[in-house]
Amino acid sequence: MSKEKPIIVWFRRDLRVSDHPALSAACAAGVPVIAVFIKDDIVDGLGAAPKWRLGKALEVFTQTLARLNIPLILREGPAGDVLDALITETDAQGVYWSRLYDPACVTRDTAIKADLRSKGLEARSFGGHLMFDPWTVETK
């Protein structure tokens, strides 16, 4: 019997299960889903109060995902390295995430997507933070 390869859903600023296109797509694929939140340099740059709120939000989010039989893995380090290690550990087929639009995140996410695809893995980003992606809006 062959084991289905899971899809990793990388959560960042989008700790929710409703109206989450990346999570919906992963669940619709019919394979196991693994959720991950990575404490990286961007999270490290937060002040004490936002870090406290994030910790509390992650506690609640872990319980919410558990009710859906989706484990939430918490890791620390550079996102690309953490995702590579998690893919190796879980034999995942790919990673899905919601797009972020600030320059540092765009640069990081573009590099991660290229790296994953170069390894033959699925790397999909989804809208989810804005009503429209910035490049789709035009003035008349």
Task: Enumerate the predicted regions with their spans.
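Trp/Phe/Arg-rich N-terminal binding region typifying the photolyase-homology
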Residues: 1-140
